[in-house]
């Protein structure tokens, strides 16, 4: 005895409803990195190094410039110098993580102390690198975070 297969031959006179529109995400399309350091040559080096790896990079030479860049823009990762010429990187870290809780922050300094390292992690930093920064190590850290 054979099996009988039924075929539904109902015609669809109306197209299937479209799914409701979704909100545009504030997340960046490609990982976006904010670099804050008061050393101009170091900023240029990091900008070049990170853009070569496909990141969208914004740089700031001061805490005020960094906070201005955060308005209306989402960053995946921030690289902050602990000692800024016109401000404190740890204080900036606190401000950035309050305004953007999902931001992953890597602190950098040429003068690490146990106190500054502890303070940075207490304020939300996820990594702490000593200058001169090893660029392959930095690239790997960012890749893991973004």
Across the structure, where does each feature detected by a protein language model lie?
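The feature encodes the CheY-like receiver
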Residues: 43, 85, 113
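Charged docking surfaces used in two-component/phosphorelay signaling
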Residues: 44-52
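Short amphipathic alpha-helix used as the core "switch/output" element in two-component signaling
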Residues: 68, 90-102
């Amino acid at each position: 005895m054979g099996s009988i297969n039924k075929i539904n031959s109902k015609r669809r006179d109306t197209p299937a409803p479209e799914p409701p529109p979704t909100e545009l995400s504030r997340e960046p399309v490609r990982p976006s990195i904010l670099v804050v350091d008061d050393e101009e040559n170091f900023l240029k080096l990091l900008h070049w190094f990170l853009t070569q790896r496909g990141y969208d990079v914004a740089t700031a030479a001061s805490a005020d410039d960094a906070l201005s860049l955060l308005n209306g823009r989402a960053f995946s990762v921030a690289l902050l110098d602990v000692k800024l010429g016109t401000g404190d990187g740890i204080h900036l870290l606190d401000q950035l993580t309050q305004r953007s809780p999902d931001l992953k922050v890597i602190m950098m300094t040429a003068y690490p102390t146990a106190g500054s390292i502890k303070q940075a992690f207490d304020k939300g930093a996820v990594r702490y690198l000593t200058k001169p920064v090893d660029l392959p190590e930095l690239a790997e850290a960012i890749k893991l975070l973004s």
